[in-house]
Amino acid sequence: MAAGAGARPAPRWLKALTEPLSAAQLRRLEEHRYTAAGVSLLEPPLQLYWTWLLQWIPLWMAPNSITLLGLAINMLTTLVLISYCPTVTEEAPYWTYLLCALGLFIYQSLDAIDGKQARRTNSCSPLGELFDHGCDSLSTVFMAVGASIAVRLGTHPDWLFFCSFIGMFMFYCAHWQTYVSGVLRFGKVDVTEIQIALVIVFVLSTFGGATMWDYTIPILEIKLKILPVLGVVGGAIFSCSNYFHVILHGGVGKNGSTIAGTSVLSPGLHIGIIIILAIMIYKKSATNLFEKHPCLYTLMFGCVFAKVSQKLVIAHMTKSELYLQDTVFIGPGLLFLDQYFNNFVDEYIVLWIAMVISSLDMMRYFSALCLQISRHLHLSIFKTSCHQAPEQVQVLPPKSHQNNMD
């Protein structure tokens, strides 16, 4: 080869793995403006706490570092609880519930101030918005698992399945309506209220033990654990009705389409396939896979959900179509095929294989996405820099603390 000859271009498949976004998508990303509206019930009093907390955060600490630290603490405390209660029917030591309460509260606090830190350091950017929502998608899964363990919901497998997946569905719907309308809307009862409610559940389990939720309420003749479940059902109905009111009334695109000019119903295919596969595998399992390994089962599908949610977020930010074909469905597909062939391989082994594939695929995609955007915008993911992109945040009145994208 002649000296000075250019290096051979990378294969297309390798480029697709390391650079998920096209040049056109990156150009549209530069034009993206984060727009949010709404104020929740607990926001005004908590704003005082968040403002106080922010003053203790050093200026050199990047907003994304704050977000990641909160996620890591939440995941770690939940994994400790999972290690004691893998089937969600056991009772863990009291300190594990207290640890989860502290972990979730710390996560909520850090998640609320990362955007404040971004504005404080003049480092707001589309990268921060993506990173924040990407971490939130994974945290949603761990919160559902931890809360289910705290009330020993494994004694009611169907309710456990519902509560494990409804949080994922609502998170996805929140960003689905954003993809349609271009505005991320927050209700009177939103993620902050849910997080505080879960902290209270963990505290109650700390002092009363997880078995306290098995107490039968006189007259009503229902177990105490059904009350938080009914709260989840009511909240899901209320929130989803608001989401679909926005979705079904048309988007901001041409002829009432999404922000990308696609059908307002198209994102439903992705979350629909995930939930249908989860239900089919749960109900058709000859070895009661979900009942025996609910935490692993939920975490595996949670990784699938997290990647699909991340794709929806970036599709909104780049005004792009959300494609259905994706490696994210390989893990659940293996479980489905194993059942189709009468459990040729032990389901538990296949579940672990699916977990490894799904988690690695999700992390690979999210990492590649963040690295590509950071290179394009000349940003550092975990350091503040004088080369940060200009602030692109628009808050619709009334002002909301949730509008904290960095």
UniProtKB/Swiss-Prot annotation:
Gene it is expressed from: CHPT1
Q: Which Pfam families match?
A: CDP-OH_P_transf
Per the UniProt topology annotation, the Cytoplasmic ranges are 2-62, 119-125, 180-190, 249-265, 317-329, 377-406
The protein, known as: Cholinephosphotransferase 1
Q: Which residues bind Mg(2+) 2?
A: D111, D132, D136
Q: Where is this site: Increases basicity of active site His?
A: E129
User: Where in this protein does the record say N-acetylalanine is found?
Assistant: A2
Show which residues sit on the Lumenal side of the membrane. 84-93, 151-160, 208-222, 282-293, 340-346
- Where does the protein end up? Golgi apparatus membrane
* Catalyzed reaction equations: CDP-choline + a 1,2-diacyl-sn-glycerol = a 1,2-diacyl-sn-glycero-3-phosphocholine + CMP + H(+); 1-octadecanoyl-2-(5Z,8Z,11Z,14Z-eicosatetraenoyl)-sn-glycerol + CDP-choline = 1-octadecanoyl-2-(5Z,8Z,11Z,14Z-eicosatetraenoyl)-sn-glycero-3-phosphocholine + CMP + H(+); 1-hexadecanoyl-2-(9Z-octadecenoyl)-sn-glycerol + CDP-choline = 1-hexadecanoyl-2-(9Z-octadecenoyl)-sn-glycero-3-phosphocholine + CMP + H(+); 1-hexadecanoyl-2-(4Z,7Z,10Z,13Z,16Z,19Z-docosahexaenoyl)-sn-glycerol + CDP-choline = 1-hexadecanoyl-2-(4Z,7Z,10Z,13Z,16Z,19Z-docosahexaenoyl)-sn-glycero-3-phosphocholine + CMP + H(+)
Per UniProt, the keywords (alphabetical) are: Acetylation, Golgi apparatus, Lipid biosynthesis, Lipid metabolism, Magnesium, Manganese, Membrane, Metal-binding, Phospholipid biosynthesis, Phospholipid metabolism, Transferase, Transmembrane, Transmembrane helix
Annotated metabolic or biological route of this protein: Phospholipid metabolism; phosphatidylcholine biosynthesis; phosphatidylcholine from phosphocholine: step 2/2
Organism name: Bos taurus
Q: Where is the active site?
A: H133
| Function recorded in the entry | Catalyzes the final step of de novo phosphatidylcholine (PC) synthesis, i.e. the transfer of choline phosphate from CDP-choline to the free hydroxyl of a diacylglycerol (DAG), producing a PC. It thereby plays a central role in the formation and maintenance of vesicular membranes.
Q: Name one GO cellular component term.
A: Golgi apparatus
The enzyme's E.C. designation? 2.7.8.2
User: Where does this chain mainly localize?
Assistant: Golgi
- State if Lipid metabolism is listed as a keyword: yes
Q: Which family does it belong to?
A: Belongs to the CDP-alcohol phosphatidyltransferase class-I family.
Protein origin, superkingdom: Eukaryota
A GO MF term: metal ion binding
Binding, CDP-choline: N64, R119
